[in-house]
């Protein structure tokens, strides 16, 4: 399944930017937040542990699913795992990594410029991560935001096991569940292995 070159370019650019030297004042990923929902524009500056999941797993959406693409045209191979409608530009969320890099970058398009953190939730709990890069999103408007997540993070481990993930970035809130009969769970598992093994 192919996604818009614009989306892929943004994901690749964010991945390359994130791989460069971090600013001296950069916060560590996976910073802690209290269990209460964060303000849409609130930044998170203190490390936090996952909070208990308060809501049930979401149901799969008919048109959407998780699709993976490997880019082996560069010196180091990378992979994108996108939640999207195939053959369209409708891709509200993606994960990307370099092979064996043990760090994963989550990308959210069309976000409010004031958003400074992204919250992820899976069957293992939830965490809030500070925004690492923010770029103009010409396709969706607003900003294309990325956060960096350790490859072995417990929220991602829960996603790998259950096949669902929720993302909150200001007013943006997506509940994203894999279709078990389309091969998406296997794609998710393959992505996580690609990033961490």
Regions from the PLM with identified roles:
Residues 1-18:
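Sec-dependent bacterial lipoprotein signal peptides
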Residues 20-28:
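Bacterial lipoprotein signal-peptidase II cleavage site
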Residues 21-22, 126, 131-197:
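Internal interaction segment
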Residues 27-37:
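Phosphate/adenylate-binding glycine loop and adjacent helical scaffold
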Residues 38-113:
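An ectodomain-focused feature that recognizes extracytoplasmic/extracellular
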């Amino acid at each position: 399944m192919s996604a818009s070159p614009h989306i892929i370019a943004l994901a690749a650019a964010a991945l390359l930017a994130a791989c460069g030297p971090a600013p001296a004042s950069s916060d560590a990923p996976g910073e802690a937040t209290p269990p209460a929902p964060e303000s849409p524009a609130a930044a998170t500056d203190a490390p936090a542990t996952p909070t208990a999941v308060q809501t049930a797993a979401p149901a799969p959406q008919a048109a959407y699913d998780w699709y993976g693409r490997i880019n082996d045209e560069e010196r180091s191979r990378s992979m994108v795992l996108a939640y999207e409608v195939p053959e369209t530009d409708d891709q509200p969320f993606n994960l990307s990594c370099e092979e064996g890099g043990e760090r994963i970058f989550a990308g959210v398009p069309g976000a409010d410029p004031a958003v400074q953190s992204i919250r992820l939730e899976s069957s293992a709990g939830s965490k809030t991560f500070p925004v690492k890069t923010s770029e103009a999103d010409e396709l969706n408007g607003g900003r294309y935001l990325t956060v960096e997540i350790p490859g072995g993070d417990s929220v991602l481990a829960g996603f790998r096991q259950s096949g669902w993930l929720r993302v909150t970035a200001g007013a943006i809130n997506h509940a994203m569940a894999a279709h078990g009969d389309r091969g998406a769970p296997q794609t998710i598992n393959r992505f996580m292995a690609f990033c961490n093994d």
